[in-house]
């Protein structure tokens, strides 16, 4: 959620910090700040609001130094304000700290420090740590940070520098992501590799409990007891251009348009029987007695799609679980179960906690993630990477499509009897099918003009189409701020039909041929109440086309692939409705790209 950037090396830190913070804007934030040290003094500049406010403030700045740290804050303790923005000083301005996550026992620590007459300028838990570092200074920054960290409860990542030990940065990870970028005589820190990718593709993903001491462009890793540890350097194969808009107005729009290209990477090398790119083969898959799919938000909706596929090909029960609820209801998980955890970032805190529960019960854990080296990738027994490149827009598009395709690939490799009724050769044509489906944009743009001022919009579908409807509704509400609700079409008569009135938009996904008659009957029900119906399907149902106000025709394909590409019109609807209403598409209010707190 919050963003961290740090630098040590021969260059001036300010432009590197501001550039890194720019690449972290997509994570969501309400204020931003930087701290730069020349070895004798630490200068902090921070502002509430967008990063541009800070940039304008620093326009004529002549701040110079040897090291620097920067932060974008997402308010948890204290309102958004200049005072609560990071970095924070201690009382003597000897220490500067930035921090992601939550210090759960900060109030008790603060109370103890106040009894000793320490003062606080902000409402944050972060400043409490800065003051405690000053209070417990041992003469060595690494030692002091490790000592204080042992007294902190919570999940967090922190980065500290001090005038008491010049040219030194110490950072630590406690369940909140932190990555070290290794350059030529320079070292970078970030909460997300995308922030430093323009400087280096050599990354070290810190493990929980890792601390790093950075001096003069060099680094050394330690555990919390100051024992040296080593971690492998991983080379990230993302291109810097993939994290840029490439001339488009919004990242989300660019990411919708590039789905044909990125899905080609998702399927590459995975279409041959026995491919080593598939982490669990059929023999092993047949040994599982139950499958748990655990995820949040968009990834959860992708899991709804996977449930039907895996039950069909393996004949075992599949349960799709919200990660935020999973570990609190004492699920009956066994050692012969497979846990499939899905997350674009691989850092979703609730999903990480759910993964720990699965592993405690000796289940085999398979992670579907996009970010190489992420926490879930390292925790899992097996990994299937999505390979869709960096996704910057908060509203997931290409990563969601990658999740659908990733699960389809797994299911097809486990499909002994072709129960999915699709072939590897057909899946190979998916990038071309996506490209053809993208041509619906002009029609969607016109349709969007009919619904962008509506207050309530409903999405319906049956079977796999319901899974797509759920994601379509989420996309619309998270970037347009319109109320959108998805439901299985057969549930309309159990309550929601009471809300349908003249002009109410109802968006129908209808790719499941065996359910077309039932879906069409549900559409007739809402039409009878005056609904404005937008249907998405192929040429299989003239009746549905005839009763719909607008019908988006999908390219000819197998039923399974038609279902997958149905999401593209829904993505376009969300984008163009939000754009017509002038909303902040890439950074919707109150939302963050990667939810790294519980």
Regions found by a protein language model. Give the residues of each.
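Acidic/histidine-rich
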Residues: 155-186, 452-478, 513, 520
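Glycine-rich phosphate-binding loops that contact phosphosugars or nucleotide phosphates
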Residues: 283-429, 462, 509-555, 573, ...
């Amino acid at each position: 959620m919050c963003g961290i950037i740090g630098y040590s090396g021969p260059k001036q830190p300010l432009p590197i910090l501001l550039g890194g913070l720019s690449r972290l804007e997509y994570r969501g934030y309400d204020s931003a700040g930087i701290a730069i040290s020349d070895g004798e003094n630490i200068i902090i500049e921070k502002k509430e609001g967008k990063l541009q406010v800070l940039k304008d403030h620093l326009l004529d700045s002549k701040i110079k130094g040897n090291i620097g740290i920067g932060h974008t804050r997402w308010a948890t303790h204290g309102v958004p304000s200049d005072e609560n923005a990071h970095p924070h000083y201690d009382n003597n301005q000897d220490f500067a700290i930035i921090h992601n996550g939550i210090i759960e026992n900060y109030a008790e620590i603060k109370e103890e420090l106040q009894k000793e007459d320490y003062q606080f300028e902000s409402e944050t838990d972060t400043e409490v740590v800065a003051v405690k570092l000053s209070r417990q200074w041992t003469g060595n920054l690494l030692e002091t940070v490790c000592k204080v960290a042992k007294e902190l409860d919570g999940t967090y990542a922190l980065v500290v520098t001090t005038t008491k030990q010049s040219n030194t940065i110490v950072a630590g990870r406690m369940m909140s992501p932190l990555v070290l970028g290794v350059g030529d005589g320079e070292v970078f820190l970030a909460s997300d590799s995308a922030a430093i990718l323009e400087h280096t593709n050599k990354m070290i993903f810190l493990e929980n409990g890792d601390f790093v001491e950075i001096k003069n462009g060099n680094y050394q890793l330690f555990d919390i007891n100051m024992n040296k540890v080593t971690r492998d350097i991983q080379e990230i194969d993302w291109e810097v251009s993939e994290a840029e808009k490439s001339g488009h107005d919004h990242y989300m729009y660019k990411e919708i348009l590039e789905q044909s290209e990125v899905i080609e990477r998702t399927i590459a090398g995975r279409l041959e029987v026995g491919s080593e790119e598939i982490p669990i083969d059929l023999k092993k898959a047949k040994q599982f007695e139950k499958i748990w799919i655990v995820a949040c938000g968009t990834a959860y909706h992708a899991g709804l799609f996977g449930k039907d596929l895996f039950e069909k090909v393996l004949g075992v029960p599949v349960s799709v679980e919200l990660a935020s609820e999973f570990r609190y209801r004492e699920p009956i998980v066994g050692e012969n179960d497979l846990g499939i955890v899905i997350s674009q970032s691989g850092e979703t805190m609730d999903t990480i906690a759910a993964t720990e529960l699965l592993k405690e019960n000796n289940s085999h854990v398979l992670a579907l993630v996009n970010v190489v080296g992420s926490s879930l990738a390292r925790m899992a027994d097996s990994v299937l990477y999505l390979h869709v490149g960096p996704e910057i827009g908060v509203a997931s598009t290409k990563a969601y499509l990658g999740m659908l395709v990733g699960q389809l690939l797994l299911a097809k490799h486990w499909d002994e009897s072709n129960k999915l009724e699709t072939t590897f050769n057909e899946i190979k044509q998916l990038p071309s099918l996506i490209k053809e489906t993208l041509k619906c944009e002009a029609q969607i743009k016109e349709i969007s003009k009919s619904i962008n001022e509506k207050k309530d919009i409903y999405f319906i579908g049956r079977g796999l189409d319901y899974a797509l409807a759920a994601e379509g509704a989420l996309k619309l509400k998270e970037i347009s701020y319109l109320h959108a609700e998805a439901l299985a079409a057969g549930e309309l008569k159990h309550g929601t039909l009471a809300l349908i009135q003249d002009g109410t938009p109802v968006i129908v996904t209808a790719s499941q041929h065996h359910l077309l008659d039932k879906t069409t009957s549900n559409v007739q029900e809402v039409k009878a109440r005056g609904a404005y119906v937008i249907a998405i399907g192929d040429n299989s149902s003239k009746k549905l086309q005839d009763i719909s106000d607008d019908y988006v025709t999908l390219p000819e394909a197998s039923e399974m692939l038609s279902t997958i590409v149905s999401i593209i019109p829904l993505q376009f609807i969300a984008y163009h409705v939000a754009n017509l209403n002038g909303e902040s598409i890439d950074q919707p209010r109150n939302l963050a790209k990667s939810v790294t707190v519980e």
